[in-house]
């Protein structure tokens, strides 16, 4: 055993001597640079959703298609608003947020919108936001995926007509549920 240990020690010493004779030296490490790198997504995060929900593969339309999510500073994706689907989603399980559906309470639906659209800004933009925020789903009046939100193109007269139509239904139907107003119902 001592012969083996002697040979091993001699080998280590010989290799150290060989390196020193060949001029191998250590060089200082390069200074850390101030370069900043930006993380880019390698795949479309909406690809799985678009397989079934947008067969034309145009992707998300309208204002939400080109904005940055203020919460994570990344482009808005399907899951930002609709949530993460379960593995059973492709089999038809309704496990993501479907706006303007009675199965979700107004507060649940609107809390998704309010995570980016601050109530103070909405209140300044148009006073009915303040009045209806807890009673009517945002999707009752606003389209989510068209090229242009219908409410943005309506004249004041058109907006008043929507108010009158909805409030007329409310007066004539005691079971009226403002969360299920089908003005601009989104199709899956």
Swiss-Prot record:
Residue positions binding heme 1: 49, 52-53
Sequence positions that bind heme 2: 78, 81-82
Record key words, sorted: Electron transport, Heme, Iron, Metal-binding, Periplasm, Signal, Transport
Intracellular or extracellular location(s): Periplasm
Signal peptide positions (record): 1-32
A UniProt-annotated Pfam family: Cytochrom_c_NrfB-like
Amino acids binding heme 3: 113, 116-117
GO CC annotations on file: outer membrane-bounded periplasmic space
Post-translational modification: Binds 5 heme groups per subunit.
Record has Heme as a keyword: yes
The keyword Membrane is assigned to this record: no
GO annotation, biological process: anaerobic electron transport chain
UniProt: heme 5 binding residues: 163, 166-167
InterPro entries: Cyt_c_NrfB, Cytochrom_c_NrfB-like_dom, Multihaem_cyt_sf, Multiheme_Cytochr_ET
Pathway: Energy metabolism; nitrogen metabolism
Positions bound to heme 4: 138, 141-142
Descriptive protein name: Cytochrome c-type protein NrfB
Organism whose genome encodes this protein: Escherichia coli (strain K12)
């Amino acid at each position: 055993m001592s012969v083996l240990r002697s040979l091993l020690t001699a080998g280590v010493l010989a290799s150290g001597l060989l390196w020193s004779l060949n001029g191998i030296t250590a060089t200082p490490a390069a200074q850390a640079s101030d370069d900043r790198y930006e993380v880019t997504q390698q795949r479309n995060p909406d690809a799985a959703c678009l397989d079934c929900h947008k067969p034309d593969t145009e992707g998300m339309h309208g204002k939400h298609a080109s904005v940055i999510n203020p919460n994570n500073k990344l482009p808005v994706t399907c899951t930002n608003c609709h949530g993460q689907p379960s593995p059973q989603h492709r089999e038809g399980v309704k496990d993501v947020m479907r706006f303007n559906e009675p199965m979700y309470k107004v507060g649940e639906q609107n809390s998704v919108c309010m995570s980016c659209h601050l109530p103070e800004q909405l209140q300044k933009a148009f006073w009915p936001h303040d009045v209806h925020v807890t009673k009517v789903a945002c999707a009752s009046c606003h389209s989510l995926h068209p090229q242009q939100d219908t409410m943005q193109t309506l004249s004041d007269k058109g907006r008043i007509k929507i108010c009158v139509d909805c409030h007329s239904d409310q007066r004539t139907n005691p079971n009226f549920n403002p969360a299920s107003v089908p003005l601009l119902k989104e199709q899956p």
